[in-house]
């Protein structure tokens, strides 16, 4: 495996792991604050990011690389609102997309077409993830501080997402 690409993939392992643990913290906050639907959404998102990380680890090792299991940054334990959760969610997904795009660019620069091909799955995933994050944040922005709207958002969150975008 090309060393520069291996480093980028290991960096991506860390980004996926950090997203997973941060989404777990968000799920815990939502659970503790009575937002059971939002909690289930973020528990599922956390698991999905963990699976993305595992897929990368396996790929690196299968390609005779050395996958590095990262130290995880401490997530924020307290959030101010549902809007803050979903603003962070969107920013996180945009960041991950940018990193994946950088990996793709470097794969083309180094003519590493095998990794480029592998990363196309992540490109598709990120299109979906950003779309979901934007849609949910847009809905929360429409709702504003209306408690009834927040209640309905929490109740219906897992039915608002098209089936192909539902976290596995």
Predicted segments with their positions:
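Iron-associated oxidoreductase/ferritin-like identity signal
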Residues: 1-168
């Amino acid at each position: 495996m090309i060393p520069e690409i291996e480093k980028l993939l290991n960096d991506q392992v860390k980004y996926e792991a950090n997203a997973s643990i941060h989404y777990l913290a968000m799920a815990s906050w939502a659970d503790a604050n009575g937002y059971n639907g939002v909690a289930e959404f973020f528990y599922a998102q956390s698991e999905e990011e963990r699976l993305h990380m595992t897929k990368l680890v396996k790929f690196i090792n299968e390609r005779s690389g050395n996958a590095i299991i990262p130290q995880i940054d401490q997530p924020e334990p307290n959030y101010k609102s549902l809007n803050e959760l979903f603003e962070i969610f969107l920013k996180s997904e945009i960041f991950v997309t940018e990193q994946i795009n950088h990996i793709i660019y470097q794969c083309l620069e180094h003519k590493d077409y095998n990794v480029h091909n592998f990363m196309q799955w992540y490109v598709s995933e990120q299109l979906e993830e950003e779309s979901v994050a934007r849609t949910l944040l847009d809905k929360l922005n429409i709702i504003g501080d209306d408690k009834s709207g927040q209640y309905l958002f929490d109740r219906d969150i897992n039915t608002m997402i098209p089936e192909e975008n539902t976290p596995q």
